[in-house]
Amino acid sequence: MNPDRVLESFLEMVAIESPSWHEAPMAAYCAGKLAEMGFTVTFDASAAETGSDTGNLIAHLAGTVPGRIGFSAHLDTVKPCAGIEAVIEQRHICDDITCRMAEVVCSAGETILSADDKAGIAAIFEGLRSVLESGAPRPDITVLLTTCEEQSLLGAGALAEDA
């Protein structure tokens, strides 16, 4: 696991506007990153049903051992998400036993940070990169990134109807 790479990936993602129904730029970014990792990327036809400007992203990578595993997250964020400026602040993090300084990523302005669900996607991508770089045996891997989750799971619902 490379913490610097996770942070870099997350900061790249939060700079991409992706409100519900307008996830295409985020989908294109994710498709490119998954393709770089060797995944075959497709999009379903759910946009016709959800009204989004893209379908759900479905990516597959053949495994080296039997079995399969899946990861899922969503591409959209709530508003306001235009012009997000992420900043890294040093803050004291305290629990019952220890206090320490930690870096915290937050929004600099009047927008949300878009951590929901871009932090999840960054974590999935870093986990995938780490496994692939290790050369460890792995089962087939599927990644599903849905649209319009913030709108009553429209993308996931459209996918389920196609299944």
Residue ranges of model-derived segments:
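Catalytic-core environment of secreted peptidases
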Residues: 60-115
